[in-house]
Amino acid sequence: MKKLVAVCLLLVGCTQAEEKMSEELQAKVLGLHDVLMPQTEQIISLKSKLDSLSTGADSTHVRKLISSLEKADKSMMDWMHHFSVDSLGKMDALTKISYLKKQLEALKNLEKSTDSSVHAAKTYPVK
């Protein structure tokens, strides 16, 4: 009987720890999303500036910069389309943790590619 009580207490403790971990992961995912979203406006602005240069002497490079910005923007839109906060409530704690870890990793990769695209576009000399 004592062993059964100990196992039950252990399971309750694990569940609470898993829930806390999933809440922390969800906060990280949503926080990173909130950091990346304003870059969408920046991407649109940079793309607009570069569009005016896309027929110049360096048009191939400019088109690559534009393509990179478009890819970053599309990746963010795709991620938002596939991510569902609502579905998290239907998952058990371990599934939720696994899902959120994957989403956080995807967003970190997205952040790297977006930062790279934005930096390249910002440093291109606009005349």
Where are the regions that the model predicts?
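Charged/polar positions within long, soluble alpha-helices
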Residues: 41-48, 52, 74-88, 112-126
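Long, amphipathic, charge-rich alpha-helical segments that form helical bundles/coiled-coils
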Residues: 62-107
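Sec-dependent N-terminal signal peptides
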Residues: 3-12
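C-terminal amphipathic alpha-helix
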Residues: 29-32, 36, 93-127
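PEST-like intrinsically disordered, low-complexity C-terminal regions enriched in Ser/Thr/Pro
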Residues: 19-28
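Post-signal-peptide N-terminal segment of Sec-exported extracytoplasmic proteins
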Residues: 32-70, 74-77
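Bacterial signal peptide processing site
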Residues: 14-18
